[in-house]
C-alpha cells in the first residue's frame, strides 16, 4: 500500500499579493475583467506547479476563490439574494463582488451580505442567505472550469467542494423563519450534477469538506448526513473531510456514511489514531492531517512519524495538512530579514508541502534519517534564551485577584466620567482608524526602507494626525481619535513594540476578499520595553479641547490575530500581553488621556469549537482584559470594541469585562445583535454600529436615524453611543466624510427629538 500525500488547499493571494492588487484594480475601474481573470489563471497554475515541485501527489482544485469559498459555493448553487441579481437573471463575477462588497463595476449597489469568521480561524466568509421555498440550480461553473485547467496542465487533480450540510449550517434564514435544513433535498440535485460532471472528466477522488462534523451538532443535523450522502454516492470516490477539531464524538454518524475515505485533523483533534483505525470501515482510506495548516512552525516530523507508523500497511493511508494551507503564509524562503536561528523554527505553506513529502517518503521506506535532520531546530528551540524571560514569568506568577478589579463599580465610575466629560446625549465617535491614504502608506514605507529619516517621518505623521483632528472637529464628532496614521495593522503595530514577537516581510494571509494581514509571530515571553501609543495620543489631545481616545488592541485579540507559540498555553500568552498593556493604560492616563479603548474584536471568535470547552477559555479571556484595564481610575472611561460577533451565548462574559462602553458591529445584522443586550439587561453603555464600513456605500441620515430609533427600543437612549461598525482605514476620505456627516446629523436630529 503506497502512501500518498496531499494538501487540503493552498494560499490564493500570491506571494506578492497579486490577487489583491488585481481585485482592487478591477474594482477601481483601472483594469478589465479579462485582466483580472488572467491573474487568477496565472496564480492557480503557479500554485499547482509549486505544490507539485515541493512533492505533493494530489493537487487541490477548487480551493481558489475570488472572494471566499463559501460565497463561491453560493453562486455554484444559484443562491444569489434578489438585491444582487442581474436583471437578466445571469450570474457573473460582479454578482459575486456585489454580494461580498455591496457594489461592483456593473450592477446596482445593494447592502453586502453579512460576513463572519470561518469557524475559529482569522479567515472570513459571506454568510449564505436562505428564504422559504428557495430554488437552487447549477449556476456558476468555476469549479469545473478550474478542474479543466488543471487537467490540461497534466496535474493529478483532487477537486475540493464544500459539503451540503456544512453549507446549510453556515447560512442564515432571511424573512419568514423556517428550518434551513429543510432545503437539503433542494440543493442535493446540484451536488449530484457537479459530481456527475467531475466523473465525466475522469476524476477519481473528490474532497468534500464537512467541517461541521467536528462541532456539537443538534441531532437533526447529524441525522441529515446519512440521507445526504446516500444521494451523493456512486459517481466518484468521496473523501469526507473534517478539520479544526477531532471527530471521535461524531464517529458513529461518520462511519455510517457511504463514502470511501475520511480526512481527520490530527493536530487540533484529540483523536487517537489507533482508535480511528479500529472504528473506521476497513476499506476506507484514512487521510491523516499531521502537518498543521494553521501555524508557521516547523513540524517535529519524528513525532508525526511515531503518531501514524503503527497503522502503516494496515489500511490505505494518505498524509496531509490538517486543514487548508490558506491560513499559512506562502514561502519562508523569501524572508531575508529573519535571523537564522529564528527562521529555522518556521515552515510556511511551501515548506509544509516539503514536510509532507519527507513524511510520505519516510513512511514508505522506513528510513527516518531525513525526519530527524529536519526536526533538529525544534529540539534546539526548547533551550533558546530568545524564548524565556524570567522577569516576565515571575510577574505573571505574582498576579492576584485584585489585579483584575476596577476600584469601583460601573455606576460610581459613570458618575465620575459624566462629570469629567460632559458629553451630549447620543454622543458620536469613531472606532479608531481613518483612511490609510497612499500618502500615509508611502510615508511609512519610505521610513521602513530607510528612505526617510526619523524627523521627517514624525513630522509627516504629526501632520496626518492634525488633519484627522481637524476633520473630526469640522464634522462635529464628540469624542475624537488620532486616526492611527502611524499604524500599519492593529495587531502588527503592537507586536512591533513588544518583546517576544517577530515579523515577516511577506508573511501575508487572506482575511477576506482582497484584505490580507501579516500576523506577528509570538516566539517567546512577552513584555513592553517602552511606551507604545502615549506620544501620539498626547500630541492629538494637545490639538483639541474635546476628548481624544487612546487606542489599544486587547490581549486576546493580539493573541488570536498572531501566530502563537505552541510550547505554552494561550492563557499564558494572553496574560503576558495583558500585563504589558496594563502599563500602557497607566502611562496613557498619566499623560492626560481620559478615554481609553481596548479593542477585543476577537474575544468571541477565539472560542473553542465545542461549547463544552468554552467556560475555561472565557474565564481566562475575560481575566486578561480586566488585568489590562483595571489599573484605570474611576473617571477614566474604558471602551472596548467587538465586531462580527453574536453575543447572546456569551453575554455573561461580555458583562464581566466591565468596560464602561462597548461598541459593536450591528448594521449588517440590522441591529439584531442588540436583542442579546436587551434580554440580558446589559448594564453599561453601548455603541451599536450604525453603518457598514466594509462597503463603500454611504448611508443616508434617515437610514441611520431609523437604526438608532430601533436601537433605542432595546437599550435606554441615555446609554447609547453613535458610531460606525468598525475602523475606517480601508475606506476613502470622500465616502468617510459623507457617511460621518450623515451619522452626526442623525445624532443631532435625535437630540432635538
Swiss-Prot record:
Gene Ontology molecular function: 5-methyltetrahydropteroyltriglutamate-homocysteine S-methyltransferase activity; zinc ion binding
Positions contributing to 5-methyltetrahydropteroyltri-L-glutamate binding: 17-20, 117, 515-516, 561, 605
Coiled-coil intervals, chain numbering: none
UniProt keyword terms in alphabetical order: Amino-acid biosynthesis, Metal-binding, Methionine biosynthesis, Methyltransferase, Repeat, Transferase, Zinc
The organism's place on the tree of life at top rank: Bacteria
Any single GO BP term: methylation
Cofactor(s) the protein requires to work: Zn(2+)
One Pfam family cited in the UniProt record for this chain: Meth_synt_1
Residues engaged in binding L-methionine: 431-433, 484, 599
Pathway where it operates: Amino-acid biosynthesis; L-methionine biosynthesis via de novo pathway; L-methionine from L-homocysteine (MetE route): step 1/1
Cofactor note: Binds 1 zinc ion per subunit.
Catalytic residues (positions): 694 (proton donor)
EC class of the enzyme, as a word: transferase
SUPFAM superfamilies in UniProt: UROD/MetE-like (SSF51726)
Binding site for Zn(2+): 641, 643, 665, 726
Family: Belongs to the vitamin-B12 independent methionine synthase family.
Name this protein carries in UniProt: 5-methyltetrahydropteroyltriglutamate--homocysteine methyltransferase
Organism: Shigella sonnei (strain Ss046)
Lineage per the UniProt record: Bacteria, Pseudomonadati, Pseudomonadota, Gammaproteobacteria, Enterobacterales
Gene assigned in the entry: metE
Amino acid at each position: 500500500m503506497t502512501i500518498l500525500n496531499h494538501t487540503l488547499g493552498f494560499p490564493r493571494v500570491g506571494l506578492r499579493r497579486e490577487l489583491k492588487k488585481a481585485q482592487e484594480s478591477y474594482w477601481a475601474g483601472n483594469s478589465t475583467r479579462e485582466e483580472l481573470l488572467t491573474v487568477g489563471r496565472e496564480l492557480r497554475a503557479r500554485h499547482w506547479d509549486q505544490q507539485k515541485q515541493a512533492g505533493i501527489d494530489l493537487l487541490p482544485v477548487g480551493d481558489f476563490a475570488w472572494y471566499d469559498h463559501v460565497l463561491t459555493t453560493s453562486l455554484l448553487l444559484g443562491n444569489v439574494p434578489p438585491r444582487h441579481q442581474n436583471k437578466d437573471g445571469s450570474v457573473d463575477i460582479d454578482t459575486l463582488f456585489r454580494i461580498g462588497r455591496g457594489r461592483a463595476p456593473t450592477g446596482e449597489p445593494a447592502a453586502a451580505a453579512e460576513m463572519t469568521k470561518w469557524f475559529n480561524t482569522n479567515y472570513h466568509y459571506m454568510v449564505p442567505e436562505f428564504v422559504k421555498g428557495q430554488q437552487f440550480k447549477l449556476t456558476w461553473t468555476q469549479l469545473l472550469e478550474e478542474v479543466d485547467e488543471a487537467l490540461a496542465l497534466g496535474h493529478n487533480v483532487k477537486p475540493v467542494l464544500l459539503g451540503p450540510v456544512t453549507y446549510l449550517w453556515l447560512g442564515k434564514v432571511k424573512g419568514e423563519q423556517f428550518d434551513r435544513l429543510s432545503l437539503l433535498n433542494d440543493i442535493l440535485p446540484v451536488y449530484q450534477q457537479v459530481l456527475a460532471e467531475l466523473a465525466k472528466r475522469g476524476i477519481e477522488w473528490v474532497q468534500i469538506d464537512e467541517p461541521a462534523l467536528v462541532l456539537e451538532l443538534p441531532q437533526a443535523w447529524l441525522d441529515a448526513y446519512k440521507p445526504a450522502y446516500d444521494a451523493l454516492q456512486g459517481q466518484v470516490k468521496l473523501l469526507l473531510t473534517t478539520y479544526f477539531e477531532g471527530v471521535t464524538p461524531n464517529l458513529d454518524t461518520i462511519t455510517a456514511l457511504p463514502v470511501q475515505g475520511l480526512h481527520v485533523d490530527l493536530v487540533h483533534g484529540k483523536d487517537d489514531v489507533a482508535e480511528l483505525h479500529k472504528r473506521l470501515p476497513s476499506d476506507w482510506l484514512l487521510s491523516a492531517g499531521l502537518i498543521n495548516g494553521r501555524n508557521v512552525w516547523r513540524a517535529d516530523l519524528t513525532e508525526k512519524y511515531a503518531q501514524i507508523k503503527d497503522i502503516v500497511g494496515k489500511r490505505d493511508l494518505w498524509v496531509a495538512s490538517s486543514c487548508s494551507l490558506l491560513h499559512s503564509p506562502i514561502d519562508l524562503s523569501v524572508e531575508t530579514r529573519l535571523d537564522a536561528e529564528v527562521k529555522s523554527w518556521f515552515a510556511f505553506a511551501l515548506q509544509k508541502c516539503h514536510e509532507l513529502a519527507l513524511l510520505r517518503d519516510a513512511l514508505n521506506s522506513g528510513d527516518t534519517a531525513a525526519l530527524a535532520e529536519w526536526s533538529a531546530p525544534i529540539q534546539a528551540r526548547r533551550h533558546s534564551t530568545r524564548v524565556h524571560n524570567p522577569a516576565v514569568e515571575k510577574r505573571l506568577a505574582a498576579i492576584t485577584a485584585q489585579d483584575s478589579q476596577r476600584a469601583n463599580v460601573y455606576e460610581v465610575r459613570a458618575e465620575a466620567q459624566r462629570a469629567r466629560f460632559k458629553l451630549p446625549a447620543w454622543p458620536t465617535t469613531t472606532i479608531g482608524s481613518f483612511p490609510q491614504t497612499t500618502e500615509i502608506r508611502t510615508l511609512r514605507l519610505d521610513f521602513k526602507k530607510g528612505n526617510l529619516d526619523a524627523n521627517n517621518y514624525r513630522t509627516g505623521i504629526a501632520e496626518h494626525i492634525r488633519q484627522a483632528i481637524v476633520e473630526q472637529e469640522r464634522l462635529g464628532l464628540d469624542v475624537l481619535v488620532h486616526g492611527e496614521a502611524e499604524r500599519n495593522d492593529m495587531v502588527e503595530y503592537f507586536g512591533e513594540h513588544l518583546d517576544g514577537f517577530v515579523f515577516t516581510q511577506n508573511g501575508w494571509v487572506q482575511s477576506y476578499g482582497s484584505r490580507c494581514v501579516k500576523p506577528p509571530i509570538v516566539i517567546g515571553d512577552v513584555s513592553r520595553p517602552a511606551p507604545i501609543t502615549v506620544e501620539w495620543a498626547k500630541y492629538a489631545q494637545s490639538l483639541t479641547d474635546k476628548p481624544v481616545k487612546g487606542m489599544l488592541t486587547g490581549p486576546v485579540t493580539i493573541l488570536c490575530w498572531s501566530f502563537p507559540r505552541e510550547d505554552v498555553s494561550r492563557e499564558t500568552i494572553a496574560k503576558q500581553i495583558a500585563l504589558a498593556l496594563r502599563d500602557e493604560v497607566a502611562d496613557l492616563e498619566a499623560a492626560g488621556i481620559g478615554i481609553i479603548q481596548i479593542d477585543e474584536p476577537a474575544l468571541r471568535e477565539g472560542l473553542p469549537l465545542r461549547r463544552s470547552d468554552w467556560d475555561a477559555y472565557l474565564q481566562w479571556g475575560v481575566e486578561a482584559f480586566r488585568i489590562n484595564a483595571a489599573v484605570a481610575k474611576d473617571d477614566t472611561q474604558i471602551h472596548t470594541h467587538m465586531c462580527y460577533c453574536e453575543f447572546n451565548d456569551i453575554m455573561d462574559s461580555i458583562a464581566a469585562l466591565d468596560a464602561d462602553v462597548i461598541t459593536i458591529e450591528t448594521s449588517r445584522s440590522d441591529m439584531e445583535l442588540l436583542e442579546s443586550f436587551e434580554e440580558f439587561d446589559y448594564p453599561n453603555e453601548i455603541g451599536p454600529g450604525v453603518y457598514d464600513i466594509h462597503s463603500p456605500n454611504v448611508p443616508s441620515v434617515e437610514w441611520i436615524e431609523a437604526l438608532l430609533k430601533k436601537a433605542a427600543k432595546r437599550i435606554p437612549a441615555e446609554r447609547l453611543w453613535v458610531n460606525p461598525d468598525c475602523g475606517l482605514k480601508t475606506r476613502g476620505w470622500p465616502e468617510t466624510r459623507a457617511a460621518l456627516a450623515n451619522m452626526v446629523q442623525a445624532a443631532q436630529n435625535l437630540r432635538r427629538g
